[in-house]
Amino acid sequence: MKIEKININEIIEYSGNTKEHPEWQIEQIKNSIQEFGFNDPIAIDEKNIIIEGHGRYLALKELGYTEVEVIRLNHLTEEQKTAYAIAHNKL
């Protein structure tokens, strides 16, 4: 697995994302990024669609980031992408 940097505007939010991120949560994520840095790459697929990391993506956009680190999970099937997202949102 390789971490790469891409322009934040190339990332696409997954339209089927069921997890809501209220503003207070985005604020907490922003505070964490400001204090500790951004060290948890966003997981995306081969089309740059977010699999996991919507909250971090929203926080980074609000903070004005133009490039972000991502991990491409091109090898996952659609079912595996869904399972991955669910598993990470339960943690």
Model-predicted regions and their roles:
Residues 1-91:
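Short, charged/polar connector segments at secondary-structure boundaries
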